[in-house]
């Protein structure tokens, strides 16, 4: 059986307790076989099309770019069933779990979007489902918690550590190490131990594949840049993968600058972290001077992750992709702008990517540029957060 490379340059690997190695090897073998199995691919494609609603639209912004020479398109992953790009790869991994004869799913979630995608998929495929979620996130994402429970998932709040995504990840891995014979750990992003970063990329790459053929059909040329927000990095790698060989296309990943990089309250390990080993992989991460994992911070729960997927670390190291950061306030502004100008309410995560695109547009209004922003999710889950912030500022 051929093996996949566990590394992207110096990044990635498989740093897990010995007890989990057989489970990861089984997963890699099943993934390789499934990728070459027309029956598996057909079932996956059928679910993507007839259950999740692919292909998603590529929408030209009519009003945001008025008075400029930019054409800005949004790849509408917010229209996918479940409300975000997460559903794509969850369907893929769940089918893989069934193929391995496993009928229980363990998952972690931050914003709750991965949890919702996992819950709906498990309901559809008749699988048992337990989802670990930081107690803080349970509080700030109550609509998604109810959605998960409504669809039959067990949601387990995690109170240890900072009670956010990284702690939920730790608990999920702990659970899996005692139950991997019957349970599959359905990791929610393109990070973690090999083969997850590769597998999640492949189960998300239709985002970029569709966007590429859609933009060629609409504009007759490739975009000048594609932009996506980066937490763990699955929506971004799904958008970037197809464009990596197209060297004329700039790849721009947007990390959360939170309250400002200088405050230390951010989630931008690619540009402001140090190389370390965490969550089963070697990648840049936010660390204290003693080398402990530092708490990340972002207004958006889905970007509140102290590390980043290894392929992004690699693309950054070779200069193929540029990584920048956007603050909470800039993301909020973009959230309001898209809602008011185009009638589309974006997730706060996606608002980071949009905010950087708006910066590019306003810095060079006379520059003819063709941009695609991956609108990775819809903002329904964030309206209470945004409402409370705007109310406290006297804006509503």
Curated annotation (Swiss-Prot):
Taxonomy, superkingdom: Bacteria
Cytoplasm listed as a keyword: no
Pathway given in the UniProt record: Amino-acid biosynthesis; L-tryptophan biosynthesis; L-tryptophan from chorismate: step 5/5
UniProt xrefs under Gene3D superfamilies: 3.40.50.1100
Pfam families in alphabetical order: PALP
Cofactor: pyridoxal 5'-phosphate
GO molecular function, one term: tryptophan synthase activity
Keywords: Amino-acid biosynthesis, Aromatic amino acid biosynthesis, Lyase, Pyridoxal phosphate, Tryptophan biosynthesis
Signal peptide as annotated in the record: none
Modified residues (N6-(pyridoxal phosphate)lysine): 86
Enzyme Commission no: 4.2.1.20
Family matches, as CDD domains: Trp-synth_B
Catalytic reaction list: (1S,2R)-1-C-(indol-3-yl)glycerol 3-phosphate + L-serine = D-glyceraldehyde 3-phosphate + L-tryptophan + H2O
Family: Belongs to the TrpB family.
Quaternary organization: Tetramer of two alpha and two beta chains.
Designated name of the protein: Tryptophan synthase beta chain
Organism of origin: Photorhabdus laumondii subsp. laumondii (strain DSM 15139 / CIP 105565 / TT01) (Photorhabdus luminescens subsp. laumondii)
